Amino acid sequence: MAGVDKAMVTLSNGVKMPQFGLGVWQSPAGEVTENAVKWALCAGYRHIDTAAIYKNEESVGAGLRASGVPREDVFITTKLWNTEQGYESTLAAFEESRQKLGVDYIDLYLIHWPRGKDILSKEGKKYLDSWRAFEQLYKEKKVRAIGVSNFHIHHLEDVLAMCTVTPMVNQVELHPLNNQADLRAFCDAKQIKVEAWSPLGQGKLLSNPILSAIGAKYNKTAAQVILRWNIQKNLITIPKSVHRERIEENADIFDFELGAEDVMSIDALNTNSRYGPDPDEAQF
């Protein structure tokens, strides 16, 4: 799709990160995920987002190799799962993910959630121990950028109070019903890029009459309107699909621009509603 490979954001360390990517949450390991990654890369995507807990890192790597797109042209994100938080366990988990992906380095490594069943260690919050390991991986150039996922402002403040390397990305649930305005403002002030997971509200927003009406103005679907809204908000966005037609359709958003009134109408849909768990309450 024209333009999808050109849309970039610049992280605080100068690394260019593709603004639009493919998420593979709930994509089953094997041929399904491998094909989805291959189709996305062949359609111009240059950013794939996975995680250790998705159990499909090997399939992502296989899809990358099958696509024929050079490794250096693809931005790969993966994430540390909660049970592996802690300094030494983080280092080991990173290496396991790297080997499963079959790559020499990872572009972006994220702490998946700030809490789990065992949030505390002797030294304090486990995600702070993990962040020290993230900084070590970054200094050793095993990863090009480091960040967090599902962090509220108070979680970020904990990290910022102790870090020597500031998180470059915060990936959170973000869509028109939960636009995270306060968190986005905080992250902007700290030069932390915000990335939207579940940008389509797990598909529940696709029948919204306001979004559908806006789409009709531009001859676009409600999904394309939402994703274009993400782009115009300078958000990184990673819609998920395993269907070739939908993968291509999702990326067909770089040939139009939402008018200011339409952006305001989408902004006004916010009700701070979540489809996923609140990070302060999640117990995985």
UniProtKB/Swiss-Prot annotation:
Pathway assignment: Lipid metabolism; prostaglandin biosynthesis
Record keyword Membrane present: no
Sequence positions that bind NADP(+): 24-25, 49, 149-150, 171, 197-202, 240-242, 246-250
Enzyme class: oxidoreductase
GO biological process: prostaglandin biosynthetic process
Localisation: Cytoplasm
Catalyses which reaction(s): prostaglandin F2alpha + NADP(+) = prostaglandin H2 + NADPH + H(+)
InterPro entries: AKR, AKR5A, Aldo/ket_reductase_CS, NADP_OxRdtase_dom, NADP_OxRdtase_dom_sf
Keywords: Cytoplasm, Fatty acid biosynthesis, Fatty acid metabolism, Lipid biosynthesis, Lipid metabolism, NADP, Nucleotide-binding, Oxidoreductase, Prostaglandin biosynthesis, Prostaglandin metabolism
Active site residues according to the UniProt entry: Y54
Any Pfam family matching the protein: Aldo_ket_red
GO molecular function: aldo-keto reductase (NADPH) activity; nucleotide binding
Residues that coordinate or bind substrate: H112
First and last residue of the signal peptide: none
Listed Gene3D superfamilies: NADP-dependent oxidoreductase domain
EC number: 1.1.1.-
Site positions for Lowers pKa of active site Tyr: K79
Disulfide bonds: none
First-listed, main subcellular location of the protein, grouped into a coarse class: cytoplasm
GO CC annotations on file: cytoplasm
Function comment: Catalyzes the NADP-dependent formation of prostaglandin F2-alpha from prostaglandin H2. Also has aldo/ketoreductase activity toward the synthetic substrates 9,10-phenanthrenequinone and p-nitrobenzaldehyde.
Stated family: Belongs to the aldo/keto reductase family.
Summary of subunit composition and partner proteins: Monomer.
Protein name per Swiss-Prot or TrEMBL: 9,11-endoperoxide prostaglandin H2 reductase
Originating species: Leishmania major
